[in-house]
Amino acid sequence: MIKVKEYRGHIRNWEELCERLDIPLDLTREEREEQILVKAYETWGNEMADHMHGMFAFALWDESEEKLFCLRDQFGTKPFYYYETADGKLLYGTTIRKIMEQPGFVKELNEEMLQLYLSLTYVAGEMTFFKGVKKLLPGRYLIWKDGKLAITRY
């Protein structure tokens, strides 16, 4: 069973996907997009982004595989962050605040990032102002399984 754990965004080609994935059109936007995410993952797996157009970032939990699958749209319109705890857990969310509210987060300033920002006035790459909190870069998906993290560009 696949569960949507986190979602932020909008799927622009929802009508086409509803037709292809046999999803009723009379659902609310929230229900419809949740079903699209689940059925697209069940149908296409890691390649689901090849079939979706829009701006989105999400996390799906695959109970049967005990695997977390997170994806960010190719343009990076919606953010997605993750953090590995000292005890081997993965915290994640579409905002840093969601990560900070979870047990296991250690709030520590990323001084290297602060120096870069003060020099360039721009935050680039996967680093954030909090040590250990990283951005999932645009056009990437993340898989967390058995305590191991793998990030792939799609």
Predicted regions and their residues:
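Cysteine-centered catalytic environments shared across enzyme families
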Residues: M1-Y154
